């Protein structure tokens, strides 16, 4: 039994390292202007987003909608509406909630600076009970002046923000993706807090 302890320790370490593979990198500018700020505005953009194996989001939506409608009339139409409405209803609130908790910056429309979270890649993942693939997002992040959004203060990238739920009961695409946005918000908030 003693010889099994190192094995389990190694297994636990490798699992914890594997689940925290998200990378955030400051690619331009300086975050020090946020040092005296207590709030920040957030905006989200989804233009020119790649989805899974598709170079254009529109192609993915058409393919998925047709596939679901073939299985059950109207199901694809319902899914397509949720694909867009989940952004305001689920993804953005989850991001903001976890970002606030980990950054100590309150989200406010009248803040001096705005964080623009531009999702550039989405892997919706899947869960069909016997096998699954986690959701994942990549994004470009810009910190700009709220009054003059052409004035970019800093740019960063977020890679591999993972969406999954404890227990694996994330059969809904929106649920998996909302967890990816929560993961991104938490990690980005901590990243900014650590830089200040």
Ranges and model annotations:
Residues 1-26:
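Bacterial Sec-dependent N-terminal signal peptides
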Residues 21-89, 93, 190-196:
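A structural "domain/chain start" motif
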Residues 24-26, 102-152, 163-171:
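Surface-exposed short loop/turn segments
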Residues 39-43, 114-116, 138, 157:
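Ser/Thr- (and often Asn-) enriched beta-sheet segments in non-cytosolic proteins
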Residues 44-49, 119-124, 157-159:
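Generic short beta-strand segments
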Residues 70-84, 150-194:
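Short secondary-structure boundary motifs at beta->alpha junctions and helix caps
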Residues 91-106:
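A structural motif corresponding to the C-terminal end of an alpha-helix
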